[in-house]
Curated annotation (Swiss-Prot), chain A:
Record protein name field: Cytochrome b6
Keywords, alphabetical: Cell membrane, Electron transport, Heme, Iron, Membrane, Metal-binding, Photosynthesis, Transmembrane, Transmembrane helix, Transport
Higher taxonomy: Bacteria, Bacillati, Bacillota, Clostridia, Eubacteriales
Assembly behavior: The subunits of the cytochrome bc complex are a Rieske Fe-S protein (PetC), cytochrome b6 (PetB), subunit IV (PetD), and a diheme cytochrome c (PetX).
Location of the protein in the cell: Cell membrane
GO CC field: plasma membrane
GO biological-process terms attached to the record: photosynthesis; respiratory electron transport chain
Length: 213, 131
């Protein structure tokens, strides 16, 4: 610690602050673990997603075959893919349950309105990650789910037509749809999610965990 | 409103509890992945639309509304407004009171909405859509 302190003055204070930070005892309760578990599910998604991305090929011709290879040939591939699948489902369930806890304990009330808002964005982002990831194996269900998604967006007023073209990569479904969903799934949405997560945690640290009711 | 706050230290009490729960979660994940692995299904076929197409469970409630409401625009706007209302919760419910028993109207409305979403999800899971 002295070695570090000499090179990074003040780091001992930071470590002390983290280690001795008092946590209200009412948070030792399963309902107060749901947010942390959602984060853990997200981290599992980052790690397993990284491994899947090593083998996955985002083109209509190769996508299905590459997922098939991950499932049947790559060592631990089937396990990694199953973990990614289950952590995705659990993440959505957990983010929803976490929202119920925050609502029923009234923890979203002043001064924590903005953190509720960040949480809502994180819920929508989770659903967006699930939607874009669903297309990637390029199975019958995943393909047609995305087609219906694009159709549904297309019937929105004003922005609908543009949104549909942007999702499909053209007036009709094109090969671009898969690359767009892929980029959204592995780059854009995860980065935006991390941004909102950081904001979420900074606000918790600044405002403190809500008092017991 | 002034209550005594009992606190526990982050190290080691809180961090070990969190670590234990995290390990249980990872264990559950591995059990699920082992017992119910994600299998391959048929590859995408642009020429054949599957019959009775249903989205994953977390989109079912919105899909059921989309299918049930005859007007397509309304079918999109209703789930949209429901999600939008979620964002507005802190501004729709402005009282300082936090105990659910002391804010019956807001909690009642919120619970009713959640039950509607749960019922629509159940309905969507059990019925055959389209085809």
């Amino acid at each position: 610690m002295n070695w570090l302190e000499e090179r990074l003055p003040g780091i001992g204070k930071v470590a002390e602050d983290i280690a001795e930070h008092p946590v209200p005892s009412h948070t030792l309760n399963i309902f107060y673990c749901l947010g942390g578990l959602t984060l853990l599910a997200f981290l599992v998604q980052c790690v397993t997603g990284l491994f899947l991305a090593l083998y996955y090929k985002p083109t209509p011709e190769a996508a299905f075959a590459s997922v098939q290879m991950i499932t049947n040939e790559v060592r631990f591939g089937a396990t990694i893919r199953s973990l990614h699948h289950w952590a995705a489902n659990l993440m959505i369930l957990l983010v929803f349950l976490h929202m119920l806890r925050v609502y029923y304990t009234g923890s979203f009330k002043k001064p924590r309105e903005l953190n509720w808002l960040a949480g809502c964005f994180l819920l929508v982002l989770s659903l967006g990650l699930a939607f874009t990831g669903y297309l990637l194996p390029y199975e019958q269900l995943s393909y047609w789910a995305s087609v219906i998604g694009a159709e549904t967006a297309g019937s929105l007023p004003v922005v609908g037509a543009t949104m549909k073209i942007m999702m499909q990569g053209g007036i009709k479904v094109t090969a671009e749809m898969l690359s767009r969903f892929y980029v959204l799934h592995v780059m854009i949405l995860p980065l935006v999610t991390i941004g909102f997560l950081v904001a979420h945690f900074i606000m918790i640290r600044v405002q403190g965990i809500s008092d017991p009711m | 409103m002034e209550k005594k706050r009992f606190t526990i230290p982050f190290m080691p009490v809180h961090i070990t509890t969190e670590a234990a729960i995290a390990m249980i979660f990872i264990g559950v994940l591995f059990i699920l992945a082992g017992v119910l692995p994600k299998e391959m299904m048929e590859p995408a076929d642009k020429l054949v639309t599957p019959i009775g197409l249903k989205p994953e469970w977390y989109y079912l409630w919105a899909y059921v509304i989309l299918e049930m409401v005859p007007n397509k625009l309304m079918g999109i706007l209703i789930p949209g407004v429901m999600v939008g209302a979620l964002f507005a919760v802190p501004w729709l419910e402005r009282s300082k009171e936090r105990r659910p028993a002391k804010r019956p109207i807001a909690v009642g409305v919120f619970t009713a909405m959640m039950l509607v979403v749960a019922a629509l999800t159940y309905y969507g899971a059990t019925i055959q859509i389209g085809g």
